[in-house]
Structure formats: C-alpha cells, structure tokens
Amino acid sequence: FPENISQVHFIKLVLKDEKGKDVSSNFYWRSNDKYEGSKTLTGPTSSGFEDLSKLKAAKVKLSYKTRQADGRYFVDIVMKNTSNGIAFFNQLQFLNSKMSPIRPSFYSDNFFSLIPGEKKTVTIETGEEKLADGAVLVLKGWNIDTQKYKLK
C-alpha cells in the first residue's frame, strides 16, 4: 500500500463474468496499524479504526416495490449512494408493526457499504401470513440517516 494512504481505507473487489456483469463482490475496511501474529488473531485486530468516527455523512436514495407469488411476499429494494463519500456498513431490517423482526425473512444481501454512485438491489422474502400486522422496512447505517418505510 502507498505510504500516504489514510489510516483507515476501503477495498472493494468485484468479480465480473465474460460479459462484464457482476458475479460477486467483497468489501473490506483496513487499518494501517501493523498486526502481529501469523493470522492476526494474536494482534491488535481492533486497533486503528478510530477514524471511522470521522466519516462524513452520506445519503442513500432508496426505492422499493412489493410483490406476491405462491403465498410468498417479496420486497425488491434498490439503493443508491448519491453522495461523494462512502455509505458505510448499512443494514436493512424488515419489521412488524411492533418494530420486531419478521421471522423468518430471507435477505439476498445485508450489512453492506456503498461507494459513491454505487447502486445495489436487495430482495427480502417472507410468507404472506407474516404480514397480518403490517410491515416496516428500515435502512440504517454508520453514517447515514435512518430511513423507515411503512409497507402496504
């Protein structure tokens, strides 16, 4: 890594197929601190990440569509980071009217970061019977304002 890299930095790896379509991606955050030990289990694995608290606020635009099929309920969510900085460590939640998780619910992805301009689609699936009391979709993250949507 270059000597002038920031104390905390981010690495995004994307695997594409022969047509250029994303197949898989991984996102990492890394500290400049030197880790001791052969596999860092004996090193200061939490050291050097204090600068995460200095991340500037980011904005994520969210839209969603709901659909039903074969007794299943789906929420297709599209999110885009519209800011110039990273939207770090975001989480989607699918909650009932009492703000408790709807279980079981299956997420195509969760706990993700978005680089500037990045768009991400996530689908949440559950049984239609789980929605008797309504549902709330929540997006929250390290440096974004929490967003809540009451689903119909």
Model-derived segments and their meaning:
Residues 36-70:
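Edge strands and adjacent loops of beta-rich recognition modules
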